[in-house]
């Protein structure tokens, strides 16, 4: 899975600077590799792992043991035997042996986004399982790959990146604030949660849980995070990893609960009403739950990796610097809990983060062509669903829409099902196969246009299903086209875009600290940052497509769409004046601009005549 970590003979590097350091976000090589530690650094490690009695540490210093000596544990043990008291030796040797195991077989992966990253051997054991390797066959961005040819990356490499960044952040906090009592167990559990947080994704990632399951299993409240927790349990038990986890110092019941809670939230939903709903870690370590999946404000290492990775593969500029933010984070207490806070001067960087998220959704994730391809794949999967059988545990058979009920069956469900349908010769799959052939030939459903409702007119989710029929009933009365269309001819895709917290400003939920008093958590209002920041943080875009290919029918469908926009008091489609010039004058609000607003720039006084108001 990678090459062994750097050689034992490397010279010790300078200790990483703290806040504002230009070093790697995970510290210098000397910080990361115990084999490069001096005696004092080993003493710090012993102290942070419960072996910190002053007399013991004094005697350990006298032994002169360094990290390089961990390779020869018998010789190391001999020095400790001479220096330490009998009841101290076992505790010291157990702690150092665990450290030696970690240092001995750390693996290095060459990641295109983060560079050379070190992965703990327990994480490597998790990676080398069928359940994790499955992520190699699930596209990170689903149907977006059909539009952006560089977006061929998968959930596998994203998961490696999240596990790595989770370790970077928690180690930085441990180094900066020893009083937090972050242990090696905590670090390992956070890394595992980051690594395994996406185990439950289905074919084409969010297309499966966002489009297919809501249609195939209507009324089922299912999330991929739920499947991630179940798949993690299945991974551990089916590969018999309990013993190896214990050998690295994990306490199974407590730590597995902690890992699952980081991925999917509190295990017991009824416990959410309690003051502290989590079981894996006490309230004193509440900040650990904000690293992998931050439910409070959405700032977490999952986003940091997919921003960087998706931008890299899409060819889109990433303006958010997660490395800098890691250097300016610390834990402060607020509301009787400890939270991860950012330095006050980083508020602009965080707005850049959410702006990057919005740009990615606009330009890539919600691309009109990528979305209609996912809709067509979803249709194909629906038509193939009842004819596909996937064997699960005890020989029981499942369909595409039910495979997530059994993790053995779900392990076999990947993007490959697209090719199985495409290349099948089974007559019962002919309808599904034909839809996929249309995608391959680029015979996509025709885009008619998009419109935006005002905030007060936004369409609620329970009305989505009736929109196609509403458009079909909107045949223009003035010069109507000689074509009758039905609801089956239209596809309506309602896209809700925001900064991650619907219509709220996510920065309102972020805590900061200032240089003058780094222990105090504060909030920063939008007005304190800039007057150029957005006034609203969400909007709804309605896109309409026609399933028919005939140009005459498509032209008529566009007129239906324009008439529907007039009826619903939505914004004018961008090409509304072209596709329905006889309809757009009927809408007063679409034609309230004076002629002077269209004066060309070559005419006199154009600067005074131009208006930029909507």
Curated annotation (Swiss-Prot):
Organism for this UniProt entry: Gallus gallus
Annotated stretches, region: Disordered: 1-33
SUPFAM superfamilies in the record: HD-domain/PDEase-like, SAM/Pointed domain
Chain residues that bind GTP: 107-108, 128, 133, 136, 442, 446, 515
Group of enzyme by EC: hydrolase
Gene Ontology CC: nucleus; site of double-strand break
Gene responsible for this protein: SAMHD1
Gene3D superfamilies registered for this protein in UniProt: 3.30.70.2760, Hypothetical protein af1432
Residues where dCTP binds: 140, 155, 201, 206, 303, 306, 310, 357, 366
Name recorded for this polypeptide: Deoxynucleoside triphosphate triphosphohydrolase SAMHD1
Source domain of life: Eukaryota
Cofactor note: Binds 1 zinc ion per subunit.
One Gene Ontology biological process: dATP catabolic process
Activity control note: Allosterically activated and regulated via the combined actions of GTP and dNTPs (dATP, dGTP, dTTP and dCTP): Allosteric site 1 binds GTP, while allosteric site 2 binds dNTP. Allosteric activation promotes the formation of highly active homotetramers.
Cited function: Protein that acts both as a host restriction factor involved in defense response to virus and as a regulator of DNA end resection at stalled replication forks. Has deoxynucleoside triphosphate (dNTPase) activity, which is required to restrict infection by viruses: dNTPase activity reduces cellular dNTP levels to levels too low for retroviral reverse transcription to occur, blocking early-stage virus replication in dendritic and other myeloid cells.
Domain SAM: 37-102
Molecular function per GO: deoxynucleoside triphosphate hydrolase activity; dGTP binding; dGTPase activity; GTP binding; nucleic acid binding; RNA binding; single-stranded DNA binding; triphosphoric monoester hydrolase activity
Residues given in the record as dTTP binding sites: 140, 155, 201, 206, 303, 306, 310, 366
Catalytic reaction equation(s): a 2'-deoxyribonucleoside 5'-triphosphate + H2O = a 2'-deoxyribonucleoside + triphosphate + H(+); dATP + H2O = 2'-deoxyadenosine + triphosphate + H(+); dCTP + H2O = 2'-deoxycytidine + triphosphate + H(+); dGTP + H2O = 2'-deoxyguanosine + triphosphate + H(+)
Limits of the HD domain: 155-307
Annotated family: Belongs to the SAMHD1 family.
């Amino acid at each position: 899975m990678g090459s062994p970590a750097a050689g034992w003979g490397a010279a010790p590097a300078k200790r990483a600077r703290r806040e504002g350091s230009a070093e790697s976000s995970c510290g210098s090589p000397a910080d990361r590799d115990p084999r490069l530690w001096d005696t004092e650094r080993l003493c710090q490690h012993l102290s942070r792992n419960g072996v910190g009695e002053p007399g013991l540490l004094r005697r350990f210093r006298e032994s002169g043991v360094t990290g390089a000596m961990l390779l020869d544990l018998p010789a190391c043990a001999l020095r400790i035997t001479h220096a330490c008291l009998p009841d101290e030796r076992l505790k010291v040797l157990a702690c150092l042996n665990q450290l030696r195991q970690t240092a001995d077989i750390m693996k290095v992966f060459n990641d295109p986004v983060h560079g050379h990253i070190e992965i703990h051997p327990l994480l490597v054991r998790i990676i080398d399982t069928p359940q994790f390797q499955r992520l190699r066959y699930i596209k990170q961005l689903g149907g977006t790959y059909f539009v952006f040819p560089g977006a061929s990356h998968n959930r596998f490499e994203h998961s490696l990146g999240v596990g790595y960044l989770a370790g970077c952040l928690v180690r930085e906090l441990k180094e900066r604030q020893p009083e937090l009592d972050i242990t090696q167990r905590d670090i390992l559990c956070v890394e595992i949660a980051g690594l395994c947080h996406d185990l439950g994704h289905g074919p084409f990632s969010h297309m499966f849980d966002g489009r297919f399951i809501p249609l195939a299993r209507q009324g089922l409240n299912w999330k991929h995070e739920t499947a991630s927790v179940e798949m993690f349990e299945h991974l551990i038990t089916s590969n018999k990893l309990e013993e190896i986890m214990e050998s690295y110092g994990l306490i199974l019941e407590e730590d597995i609960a902690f890992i699952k809670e980081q991925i999917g939230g509190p295990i017991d939903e009824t416990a959410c009403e309690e003051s502290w709903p989590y079981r894996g870690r006490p309230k004193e370590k509440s900040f650990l739950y904000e690293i992998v999946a931050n439910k409070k404000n959405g700032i977490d290492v999952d986003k940091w990796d997919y921003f960087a990775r998706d931008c890299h593969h899409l060819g889109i500029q990433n303006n958010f610097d997660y490395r800098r933010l890691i250097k300016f984070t610390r834990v402060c207490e607020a509301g009787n809990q400890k939270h991860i806070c950012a330095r006050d001067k980083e508020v602009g960087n965080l707005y850049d983060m959410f702006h990057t998220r919005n740009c990615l959704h606009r330009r890539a994730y919600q691309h009109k062509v990528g979305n209609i391809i996912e809709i067509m794949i979803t249709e194909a999967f629906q038509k193939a669903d009842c004819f596909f059988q996937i064997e699960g545990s005890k020989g029981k058979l499942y369909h595409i829409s039910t495979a997530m009920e059994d993790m053995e069956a779900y392990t076999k469900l990947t993007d490959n099902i697209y090719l199985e349908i495409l290349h099948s010769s089974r007559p019962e799959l002919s309808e599904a196969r034909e839809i996929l052939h249309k995608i391959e030939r680029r015979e996509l459903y025709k885009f008619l246009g998009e419109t935006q409702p005002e905030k007060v007119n936004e369409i609620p989710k329970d009305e989505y299903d009736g929109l196609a029929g509403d458009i079909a009933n909107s045949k223009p009365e003035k010069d109507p086209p000689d074509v009758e269309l039905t609801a089956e001819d239209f596809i309506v895709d309602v896209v809700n875009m925001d900064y991650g917290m619907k219509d709220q400003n996510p920065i309102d939920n972020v805590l900061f600290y200032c240089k003058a008093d780094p222990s105090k958590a504060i909030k920063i209002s939008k007005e304190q940052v800039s007057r150029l920041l957005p006034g609203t943080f969400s909007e709804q875009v309605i896109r309409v497509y026609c399933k028919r290919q005939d140009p005459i029918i498509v032209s008529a469908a566009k007129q239906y769409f324009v008439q529907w926009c007039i009826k619903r008091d939505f914004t004018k489609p961008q090409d509304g004046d072209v596709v329905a010039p006889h309809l757009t004058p009927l809408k007063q609000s679409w034609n309230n601009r004076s002629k002077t607003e269209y004066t060309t720039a070559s005419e006199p006084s154009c600067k005074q005549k131009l208006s930029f108001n909507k």
